[in-house]
Amino acid sequence: SSDVCSSDLILPLVAYLLVVFGLSIYAMRKRTTGAFLNEYFLGSRSMGGVVLAMTLTATYISASSFIGGPGAAYKYGLGWVLLAMIQLPAVWLSLGILGKKFAILARRYNAVTLNDMLFARYQSRLLVWLASLSLLVAFIGAMTVQFIGGARLLETAAGIPYETGLIIFGVSIALYTAFGGFRASVLNDTLQGMVMLIGTIVLLVGIVHAAGGLTHAVETLEAIDPKLVSPQGADDILSPTFMTSFWVLVCFGVIGLPHTAVRCISYKDSKAVHKGIIIGTIVVAVLMFGMHLAGALGRAVIPDLTVPDLVIPTLMVKVLPPFAAGIFLAAPMAAIMSTINAQLLQSSATIIKDLYLNLRPEQVENERRLKHMSAVITLVLGALLLLAAWRPPEMIIWLNLLAFGGLEAVFLWPLVLGLYWERANAAGALSAMIVGGVLYAVLATFKIQYLGFHPIVPSLLLSLLAFVVGNRFGQPVPQPAMISTDK
């Protein structure tokens, strides 16, 4: 019977991938002529509100929200659901703090990547090289882990062997990102956001039904372990320091993540931002609450999972009819794909704009070469990631731990202070980046938890301090000339 079941599961998945390809081809056809870099990496700055909200949410919500998060909720109970809700202001914070100023400056400097912004603001080559390298290293770690997550998911739910799953996954993402660019990435994010929303709601209803209603489900949880329904969670894991760290890492710190930040450069007008903030926050709320609650209540349906991470895929196959499970399986796949495509684009933009064009500025006019390079680099990066995920070395898992927090530690202050503090200069920004990055790497590697805080907290604080001290020694930045080619 498993054969029948898995073919029913795979059909919707294939259909879904086809739709994704269709959208990419559409994005390719819609490309505006001229200003290639601006179009490929930013979709010519033309996003409206709904699309902006969806792309931010879909980029922000990755495999972890569909796999790791609910897994933790399964293990620690309803308290974790509450903890997950701290993430709510993420959209509002990144659009509110960065959004407007960022977009205005980006248009003024004609910036395409985050590093363009940093260069225009601090006028330091060294800074841009450092930023580019840390970005590439971190993204390679983060993307590989997402790939692994995607393949594991297919393995559990549809019984597709790990290697096959990896190939299906990697090839389709690399292709559509390479050919469609930012526009394809954003359109697909919008589609993926919709799929995630519908999927979450359907699954939650299915679980509550299978557990025999909400009251019954909570009673079952209490019978398993009374702490599952207490605010502190099982093993009393949710202490105030833990909560603070979690908030800094996944909510406040998100402002510093390059692939979220770049979404702030690419919208149309203020109306789009205001709409984006409202819609985005609602979508994040529904998704976060839905997925984590599903994980926590899932314990009442399947009490004896050994690997909590598999709670969602297992529930899907158990609670939903095969065809519906297939559609829903597309949701976490969507989450993973939208996160990877954003990071892939960001990496290839970094290589081309910040490393290659910095060395050979005369190539800017050479549209054809840039087009080929962008596509080729995106594909090559995709291939490298596949290799890394094929036999995941221990290093990779460690890299990913570093990736998220490390990026925040490196980028957060130079970005925010660059926008809001007139006197910020290159010396300050460099010292902040080096202190933040190195400190985070050291603390995370040796698992040092100062006063029980996650390494991100001391790293950000000291990085801020380093910025202020370093700033004393630097020269003020000369006001850059207005470089403006587009409107």
Language-model regions, residue ranges each:
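Membrane-embedded helix-loop-helix hairpins and adjacent transmembrane boundary segments
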Residues: 2-487
